[in-house]
Amino acid sequence: VTIDKGDIMVVIGPSGSGKSTFLRCLNCMEDPTGGQIIFNGVDIADPKVDINIHRRHMGMVFQHFNMYNNKTVIQNIMLAPVLVRCQDLKKAKRHNRMLPLTNLFRKEKQEKIEITTSKSQIVAEARAKAEELLKRIGLEDKADVYPSTLSGGQKQRVAIIRALAMNPDVILFDEPTSALDPEMVGEVLD
């Protein structure tokens, strides 16, 4: 199967036929039993590949939403962007701290990484993006509530914008409307 940028692909089959397993393999949440998964030119099924680097470019919307019930809606949306960018910030700071020692043993000297942000700035940017996304789906008034207070359609819309908050190259949807009644299906698709 080849899926190019901008393509929309739907996998249809009876219950138990492997649709969810296929999606979980695409995101390397499960190991494929054979073949390759080429994403942005890299076989991400190769055990030597750091899948976390590639997962940053994949959004996943789960059948059962997979939201953290102990976090508010906005915290659920902000979680991944803040975590990923703070990890990058931490790596850059560690790189810069180790640079004098690293360069002692290398012929080709490494450069210092310019750090242009802070954790508080990362959090502020993630919050602004989350607020903008909530506004786009008409749920800005639900930012500070917990997922348990949302309807199924609202949870699914939040799950979708949570995936969008990472600016992914691709979004994988695992039965995005299966847990919804017909009225809520229309709400999510709108």
Residue ranges and their predicted role:
Residues 44-59, 83, 119-128:
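ABC ATPase NBD coupling module
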Residues 165-169:
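A short, proline-enriched helix->beta-strand linker immediately N-terminal to the Walker B motif
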Residues 27:
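Helix-to-loop junction immediately C-terminal to a conserved catalytic motif
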Residues 160:
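Hydrophobic anchor residue at the start of the ABC signature
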Residues 146-150, 154:
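Conserved ABC ATPase signature
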Residues 35-42, 46, 94:
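Conserved ABC transporter NBD signature motif
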